[in-house]
Structure formats: structure tokens, C-alpha cells
């Protein structure tokens, strides 16, 4: 686990404990998060998940804003319970009052789109390319059939792939 991020989580908790004059249980921290989300707080599991790739690409802002954002969710839940809104007044109070940060809901990190292989299926219709995902292609190999909406013929794998 990146040591700076672990230290930042601890610093955020120490700030919250000083501000609210009470202890908070420390969460488990995981880097099993991919895609567009920078971080996720699992309230009932006391778990923080972070996107390691976005952390590496945006380290300074990630440590300052994203870590505090996710810790604030756990602190708000432990202080105010289940009935609060995710980015409601209580969470905003913690972001502004404890961490002195803007309560931004979303990051603006550039996210790399995943390279996807498409499997090209065809029917007798002219210009009928049907790019299937790997998941749909696997379903066809397992026996599922897909029909063209125009000619009602079964789509057949052409043997071609395309990277998007």
C-alpha cells in the first residue's frame, strides 16, 4: 500500500478526532477499485477503497482532496448515522470545518478508457457489422443465439476482431 496515502488517512482521522473530541475506529484500506471512481467509502464495513492508477497519476490532489473526501464519509456516518445524505450538510460540514477543503462531489482527473476488443458478427444484410463484447462473444460460444433485427437471420462470427 502506498505509504503516503496510508499516512494521509491517519492524518485525516487525527484531525477529525481533534475537531470532534472523540476517537474514531480506523478503516481497512484497499486499492481494489478501477474505472472512473477515485475512491469509495463502504460505511457499514468501515472500508475505504481507492483507485491506485488515479492515485499514481494525480498524487498531490488525490492525497489532499480524495482521501479527505472518503474519510469524511466514514466520519459523517459514525457521527450522524444512516439517515444522512452522502454529500449532504453533515459531510459538507466535515469537509469545510475539519479539513478546510471545498466539498467537491466529483474529481476531474483524466481517466484512461480501457482498450476493448470487439468480435465482429455478421448476417446476410449488406453492411451488417455487429461488434460484440468479449462477454457476449463468450455467450455465443456457449450456445446463445442472436438474430439480425432486419433479416431475422442468426448472427455469425466473422473471425475478425477490432480494438476500440
Curated annotation (Swiss-Prot):
Transmembrane segments: none annotated. GO terms for cellular component: cytoplasm. It is found in: Cytoplasm. Coiled coil: none annotated. Its main location: cytoplasm. Residues 14-156 form the SprT-like domain. Pfam families: SprT-like. Zn(2+) binds at residues 69, 73. The active site is at 70. Binds 1 zinc ion. One of its GO terms (molecular function) is zinc ion binding. Keywords: Cytoplasm, Metal-binding, Zinc. Its cofactor is Zn(2+). GO terms for biological process: response to stress. SMART domains: SprT. Belongs to the SprT family. This is Protein SprT. It comes from Pseudomonas entomophila (strain L48). The lineage of its organism: Bacteria, Pseudomonadati, Pseudomonadota, Gammaproteobacteria, Pseudomonadales.
Amino acid at each position: 500500500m502506498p505509504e503516503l496515502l496510508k499516512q494521509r488517512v491517519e492524518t485525516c482521522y487525527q484531525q477529525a478526532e481533534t475537531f470532534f473530541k472523540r476517537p474514531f475506529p480506523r478503516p481497512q484500506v484497499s486499492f481494489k477499485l478501477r474505472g472512473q471512481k477515485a475512491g469509495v467509502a463502504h460505511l457499514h464495513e468501515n472500508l475505504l477503497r481507492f483507485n491506485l492508477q488515479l492515485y499514481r497519476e494525480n498524487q498531490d490532489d488525490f492525497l489532499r482532496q480524495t482521501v479527505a473526501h472518503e474519510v469524511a464519509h466514514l466520519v459523517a456516518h459514525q457521527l450522524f448515522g444512516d439517515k444522512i445524505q452522502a454529500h449532504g450538510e453533515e459531510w459538507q460540514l466535515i469537509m469545510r470545518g475539519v479539513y478546510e477543503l471545498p466539498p467537491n462531489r466529483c474529481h476531474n482527473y483524466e481517466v484512461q478508457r480501457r482498450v476493448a476488443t470487439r468480435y465482429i458478427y455478421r448476417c446476410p444484410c449488406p453492411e451488417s457489422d455487429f461488434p460484440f463484447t468479449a462477454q457476449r462473444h463468450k455467450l455465443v460460444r456457449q450456445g446463445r443465439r442472436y438474430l439480425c433485427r432486419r433479416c431475422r437471420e442468426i448472427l455469425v462470427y466473422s473471425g475478425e476482431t477490432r480494438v476500440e
